[in-house]
Amino acid sequence: MSIEQLKEQIPDFAKDVRLNLSSMASDESLSPQAKYGLFVACAIATRNPTVTAALEAVAAAHLSAAALTAAKTAAALMAMNNVYYRFVHLATNKEYATMPARLRMNAIANPGVDKADFELWSLAVSAINGCGTCIDAHERVLKEAGVSAASIQTAVRFAAIIQSVAVAIEAAAVTVPLAAE
């Protein structure tokens, strides 16, 4: 499925979402690997199979097998880490912050692609999943690696757009009879 075909599934009440998707698709401010890895990782984070299939198909033409796998890995690891570290952050009992996580996450240290790209994908997924601790950690690593604030903002903007595409498509699938006027 192409971006155009995905746009056709977005209902008229979400015209702004369609326009944002078009803008995202034509944005060239990130490297192709960073951009299309974001498409994959963020689409997976939406848990919407239509969006995931479409954006993975688009990205496959621009990513190596290793980069495609790394983007999927970022989404999977953040699904775990975002739940755990959001709990640690939000729990009133701060004892949990002193306990070892005991979660395997070796791929973060050796993702098989440029570390900054993997961190960018992880940051964007963490934004979708709402983990402030993870957002701060990934943003700090990205800044230390010399990634600009504009690139970081672009990644989070892509995450917001991809999430809104998933929600718009899901909302269009729900039909409720309207009360007679």
Curated annotation (Swiss-Prot):
Kindly provide the name given to this protein in its UniProt entry: Alkyl hydroperoxide reductase AhpD
Q: Which reaction does it catalyse?
A: N(6)-[(R)-dihydrolipoyl]-L-lysyl-[lipoyl-carrier protein] + a hydroperoxide = N(6)-[(R)-lipoyl]-L-lysyl-[lipoyl-carrier protein] + an alcohol + H2O
Provide one Gene Ontology biological process annotation: cell redox homeostasis
Q: Which family does it belong to?
A: Belongs to the AhpD family.
UniProt cross-references to Pfam families, sorted A to Z: CMD (PF02627)
The answer, when asked if Oxidoreductase is one of the entry's keywords, is yes
Q: What is its EC number?
A: 1.11.1.28
Cysteines joined through disulfide linkages: C131-C134
Enzyme class, UniProt record, top EC level: oxidoreductase
Matching NCBIfam families, A to Z?
ahpD, ahpD_dom
Its annotated function is as follows: Antioxidant protein with alkyl hydroperoxidase activity. Required for the reduction of the AhpC active site cysteine residues and for the regeneration of the AhpC enzyme activity.
Q: Where is the active site?
A: C131, C134
| Keyword Disulfide bond (UniProt) | yes
